A protein has these predicted regions:
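Peri-catalytic and regulatory segments of divalent metal-dependent proteins
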Residues: 1-70, 122-123, 139-143, 147-149, ...
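Short helix/loop segments within enzyme catalytic domains
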Residues: 1-7, 90, 94-151, 171, ...
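Alpha-helical membrane and juxtamembrane elements of multi-pass inner-membrane transport
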Residues: 30, 44, 69-72, 90-94, ...
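Residue-level signature of catalytic and energy-coupling elements of molecular machines
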Residues: 32, 112, 154
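Generic alpha-helical structural context detector
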Residues: 48, 72-76, 80, 117, ...
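Post-HEXXH active-site segment of zinc metalloproteases
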Residues: 62-93, 131
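Catalytic and substrate-binding regions of cell-wall glycan-acting enzymes that process beta-1,4-linked
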Residues: 143-165
Length: 179
């Protein structure tokens, strides 16, 4: 996958946890839980998940998150001082900072989803893998209710976007239905 994405190979760590999850750390390594490995049923699904995480690394999301967090923190400190530095001002700044950070994170998740779909097409792989992987994880974890504080967009919105992106690239592709 790294050669398709034109990036360095990322070290892979397997963490023994039941909860299905995967993440990229410091933009330099990927961790996958055994719970995710047990949940996924097709090689294309693991390719999709790893492509999504590689997308975070390739697109520089770790650096962007750190930079954004620092900027939001500094702005928050300044605003808190402008509004008197009291507990209410601090609360308002914290809420605003959390909303801003979550919004940035949601955008990055969509970018990583798009990266995974596009990478599958580029590599001649089945682009439905990321779709069915997310669908399985969504069914396992339950429905994420829309909230400004969520770091990920609601799964149904992500799935619809992926479905549309796949069909734009190749209308003949049939999205598998999972049980």
């Amino acid at each position: 996958m790294a050669h398709i994405a034109e990036m360095e190979l990322l070290p892979l760590t397997i963490e023994h946890k039941d909860a299905p999850n995967a993440w990229v750390t410091n933009g330099k390594s990927v961790t996958v839980t055994t719970g995710l490995m047990n949940l996924l049923q097709r090689e294309e699904e693991m390719f999709g998940v790893l492509s999504h995480e590689a997308g975070h690394a390739k697109l520089g999301h770790y650096g962007s998150t750190v930079t954004s967090s620092i900027g939001i923190g500094v702005a928050g400190l300044l605003l808190n001082q402008v509004f008197g530095g009291g507990a209410l001002g601090e609360l308002a700044v914290n809420v605003g900072a959390n909303l801003a950070t979550a919004g940035i994170s949601r955008e990055m998740e969509v970018e990583a989803d798009d990266f995974a779909v596009d990478l599958a097409f580029k590599g001649g792989k089945d682009p439905t893998g990321i779709y069915t992987a997310l669908e399985r994880m969504s069914k396992y974890g339950g429905k994420l209710e829309p909230s400004g504080f969520n770091s990920h967009p609601p799964d149904d919105r992500r799935l619809q976007r992926m479905r549309n992106r796949i069909r734009e690239r190749d209308p003949s592709i049939v999205i598998p239905v999972i049980d």
